Design a protein with these regions (language model features):
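A short glycine-rich, His/Asp/Glu-containing loop-to-beta-strand
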Residues: 1-44
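Intrinsic-disorder/low-complexity, polar/charged segments enriched in Ser/Thr/Lys/Arg/Asp/Glu/Gln
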Residues: 11-13, 75, 85
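Double-stranded beta-helix
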Residues: 1-3, 100, 107-153
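Short Gly/Pro-enriched loop/turn and capping motifs at secondary-structure junctions
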Residues: 51-54, 70-73, 92-95, 101-102, ...
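Short edge beta-strand segments in beta-sheet-rich domains
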Residues: 42, 75, 101-106
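Beta-sheet entry/capping signal
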Residues: 62, 85, 103-105
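A short beta-strand-loop-beta hairpin characteristic of the jelly-roll/cupin
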Residues: 47-82
Length: 153
């Protein structure tokens, strides 16, 4: 919605759609003040949980979200319900998991103290190999890629 190519002071926004029974925001990644990361952003997730095959939101549906730090000072797996908000102050986060039958939407809001706006991230090295297996894969047609100018795929 609001990538680094658009005008803003420090805010970045992105939307993610995760079909029911699937994962997103994986491999776990971070955008914090760590030596290997080029940016320092805090991130807030705003979740909506739907009902498969409808445009309705679900009071009963749920998902999961994981956040952790290498030193173990943060290590949480939280159950997400429709309308929940989760703040990631630092550390690796992901995956977000949508329960079968309950597609998940989330709005990511990022901001940080740096002068340059960037959505850059660093994968958890333990799981980075997973990203390398995606080369050549077609995007999932249930998750359309769009910009402010419309659908790109």
């Amino acid at each position: 919605i609001l990538p680094e190519t658009e005008t803003a002071e420090s805010l970045l926004l992105a939307e993610v759609i995760t079909p029911g029974g699937h994962w997103s925001s994986y491999p776990p990644h971070r955008h914090d003040d760590s030596p290997e990361c080029p940016v320092n952003n805090e991130e807030i997730y705003y979740f909506r949980i739907g009902v498969a095959g409808t445009s309705e939101y679900s009071a009963d549906g749920f998902g999961m979200h994981r956040t952790y730090t290498p030193d173990g000072s943060i290590d949480v797996n939280v159950v997400i319900h429709d309308g929940d908000v989760f703040c990631v102050p630092r550390g690796y986060h992901g995956p977000c998991i949508a329960a079968p039958g309950y597609p998940m939407y989330y709005l990511n809001v990022l901001a940080g103290p740096g002068g340059e706006r960037s959505m850059a991230f660093c994968d958890d090295p333990t799981h980075h190999w997973v990203r390398e297996t995606w080369a050549g894969m077609a995007p999932d047609p249930r998750c359309p890629m769009t910009t402010k100018d419309g659908r790109t795929q």
